[in-house]
Amino acid sequence: MRRPKKYESGEATQYISRRAALRKLQLSLNDFRRLCILKGVYPREPKHRRRAQKGSSEIKVLYHTKDIRFLLHESIVWTLRDYKIFAKKSNRDRAIKDFRNLKRRLALFPEIKLDHIVKERYPTFIDALKDLDDCLTLLFLFSTFPSLHLIPREQSNLCRRLTIEFLHYVIASKSLRKVFISIKGYYFQAEIKGQKVTWIVPHYYPFKPQSRQEVDFKVMSIFVEFYTIMLGFTNFRLFHGLNLAYPPQFPSSVLQDSEESLKDEASFVSDRIAALNFELLRTDKVQEDEEELDIDMELLEQDGDSKRIIKMKQEAQEVSRLRTLFKGLKFFINREVPREPLVILIRSFGGKVSWDSSIFAGSTYDEGDETITHQIVDRPSISTQYISRDYIQPQWVFDCVNQRQLLPTNKYFIGETLPPHLSPFVDSKRDSYIPPEEKALLDPSLIETHAQSDDDSEDEAQEEEETVDQELLDAQLQLAYQQETAEYKKYGGPDGVNEDEEDPEDEDDNEDDDEEEEELDEKTKRLQEEKQKMSVQSGKVHKVNKRQVHKAEVDEHRLQARMVKPRHRNLFRKLIREKQSKEKEEWLLRKKRRTIEASEKEARKTAKREARKEAAAAAAKASKLGK
């Protein structure tokens, strides 16, 4: 039996370098990169790099050997090789100026078909939905790009069409759950087939070309090439699940014979689809969403009353209320407000929305409509206002969705300082600082209580002080009254008669008073005895030595650090640093919050003092005038 040589088995045979993979596949680096992106093959990090690289200490890009063997049997490899042949022949035709043959070759340009790769990477529809986050974020980004050197116009238009179709599904299914505005853009989260899909829609700013090529648009364009095919399959399946016609179409009531529709019906329909403001054509007229929800509730009611079932019932009831949050409300969007995100939100929750017809096609009513309940404005003032509607800032719509209820509009009026816009995507069970506004977001019953807690505490303290002062004043008055009565009895009545010359009736009264005083003394003695019986003995205070506790914690931490394996020490140190930074950040946030609250409390106290002084001065002035 032959003795195996070194690096012929084990980890050395499990990995292959990128250069060896290029030689094995006979592809260029760009083609290999494109093939790996389309097939979902990515570099790997071995446990022992030196063994995997057969003794070499040089850092190389490594792949699994089985992944490269998997790529050998891919039909796209032949198409990529055909590209090389096509490039050589087309260059030859250009050189000899054979334009007739060149035109024929361009018509036979080899195209890559990715349908089988989508089915291969996502065997089930749920697998595709799980990987939809990055797909939607990238396609929404590319839908805002103009025609660039490495991004053709057709690709941007295709991204725009597919993302609009997906938004139509979200609106029709009412599957939107969370929203948030950040510097990056608008965060949306929808629940589709039980899977939470989160994506980002960028802000609508004019495109600014880059001076330096910091972003590799070519690699991103390859990802977009795959994701467009994937989202096309997903949209087709989602639309047919809701009995919607695909590609999206409108009912005949929308396509009325107007000059605009008769001139160019295709552009008319595409503009109305992009407006997101019309119902799409259904293959059947019955909407089964509410029926399915009722069936689910009946199934839940048939089960037991366990905590899990109760929680699921509550969540189902909240979702059913959320789906009709804006039902019966009519919104009008001003021209300075971003149209598309608000249209998605309002229509996803049952509301009606419109805008100025000069901004974009698809408006259904004008600003002068008297049935409008809310007008969304993002400017400090507006010239003409209607009494029958509320003028609110855009954040009101987002906060209502996150808190799953219609909030009061007084905090969101024109010119008002808006409340903090908190993210609903953070973990509520995390061990870190949670501001009171976020607690109110998690528990709607605390929305107003955290704002009034300081005022209530101040009022209670003030009431306690007033009651204490009143009790002291009553005690002093009672003592003074007793002293006066004693002196009165001792030195004589109103006629100047001494105690020695008193009548027998007065003597009887004095005897009665003495008896009452004796009874009071007996009561006080009895109370003192009861207090002595119920007295608590003084206990011993257990003093904690903070130095010893800190030393014990440090020793325990050092012992944990010693027990960590050498290869995991860097990871352990990294985790400790992250923990320390989180604790420091939490401490700083708490300190900042305390200073802000203390300054606000002091300002409120000074304002109250000034108000009391003014009221006292006004009362004194009024009393002088009255005299």
From Swiss-Prot:
Residues 582-625 form a coiled coil. InterPro entries: BRCT_dom, BRCT_dom_sf, PES. Its main location: nucleus. Residues 522-533, 550-559, 595-615 have a biased composition (Basic and acidic residues). PROSITE patterns: BRCT (PS50172). Residues 450-469, 488-566, 595-627 are annotated as: Disordered. The keyword Repressor does not apply. GO terms for cellular component: nucleolus; nucleoplasm; PeBoW complex; preribosome, large subunit precursor. Residues 540-549 have a biased composition (Basic residues). The keyword Transmembrane helix does not apply. Residues 321-414 form the BRCT domain. Residues 454-469, 497-521 have a biased composition (Acidic residues). Keywords: Coiled coil, Nucleus, Phosphoprotein, Ribosome biogenesis, rRNA processing. The modification Phosphoserine is found at residues 453, 457. Residues 616-627 have a biased composition (Low complexity). It is found in: Nucleus, Nucleolus; Nucleus, Nucleoplasm. One of its GO terms (biological process) is maturation of 5.8S rRNA from tricistronic rRNA transcript (SSU-rRNA, 5.8S rRNA, LSU-rRNA). One of its GO terms (molecular function) is ribonucleoprotein complex binding. Belongs to the pescadillo family. Required for maturation of ribosomal RNAs and formation of the large ribosomal subunit. This is Pescadillo homolog.
